[in-house]
Curated annotation (Swiss-Prot):
Main location: cytoplasm
Database matches in NCBIfam families: apt (TIGR01090), PRK02304.1-1 (NF002632), PRK02304.1-2 (NF002633), PRK02304.1-3 (NF002634), PRK02304.1-5 (NF002636)
Function of the molecule: Catalyzes a salvage reaction resulting in the formation of AMP, that is energically less costly than de novo synthesis.
UniProt name for this protein: Adenine phosphoribosyltransferase
Subunit: Homodimer.
Gene Ontology BP, a term: purine ribonucleoside salvage
Keyword Kinase appears in the UniProt entry: no
EC number(s) given by UniProt: 2.4.2.7
PANTHER family for this protein: ADENINE PHOSPHORIBOSYLTRANSFERASE (PTHR32315:SF3)
Subcellular location: Cytoplasm
Amino acid sequence: MNNDSLAIIKQSIKTIPDYPKPGILFRDVTSLLEDHTAYKATMDILVQHYKDHGFTKIVGTEARGFLFGAPLALELGVGFVPVRKPGKLPRETISESYELEYGHDVLELHTDAINENDKVLVVDDLLATGGTIEATVKLIRKLGGEVKHAAFVISLPDLGGAKRLEEMDLELVTLCEFEGE
């Protein structure tokens, strides 16, 4: 990975103190999206890293995972599968509940979106506690998909998500890390 590109990416991410609650330093990836150079650098790095992995599907988690997963799928020439909150997907779904850094939620995946022939990469904007991706991986594996890789733009290592996901036999790629919550 190009250190100059990684620096551009990290510098483009704004930190918002006390959002969504006091004591949290929110890492705002939307500021990266507003910066064409940073967004392109992000996508270029992900494409270069994953172009020869043989994935058949990219799964993105609601909602900011879509912003990186869908363009990556397009560039890799594979399908994109959204994982959504309850009631947002129109076909038959399976669901998985999970804990996140600010509470509890549920994710859903179409039952016909992944099968035993799929080799899947999971993409999200941020790795914090790992709960969202753990639930996403469980959904994919329930449908028979193989998932061994997850990619993130941002990681907050102090929250332990990387360790949690590595215990699920996932190989992680993170473009930049920030201290704290």
